[in-house]
């Protein structure tokens, strides 16, 4: 399971509400500019793929596309929505996981120290990958 919080006025919110599914694409730090562009420009009026240079790739179990340049993609179906004030939290069941082979450890788990993956949290972008325990 995974959770994503989105404001109800966002275009992506309407798409998730209508389809009941979404994809989480985990970008790497070399995609910072494209990621920031996609985060601030609405797809309501602009084709983000053509403008950002990112490549849509068909998903295997849901309608929304994967982003080919992202090394980790999670295809999800909405199982619950929780209202949290300014945002709603969509809880999604991961129905398919795509990971670049060279990012897997000997057990087949994602080794995030190899990904240079990043995330956005309130005031900026942060690199993921240092195991604490």
Task: Locate each region found by the language model.
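Basic, polyanion-binding surface patches
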Residues: 1-133
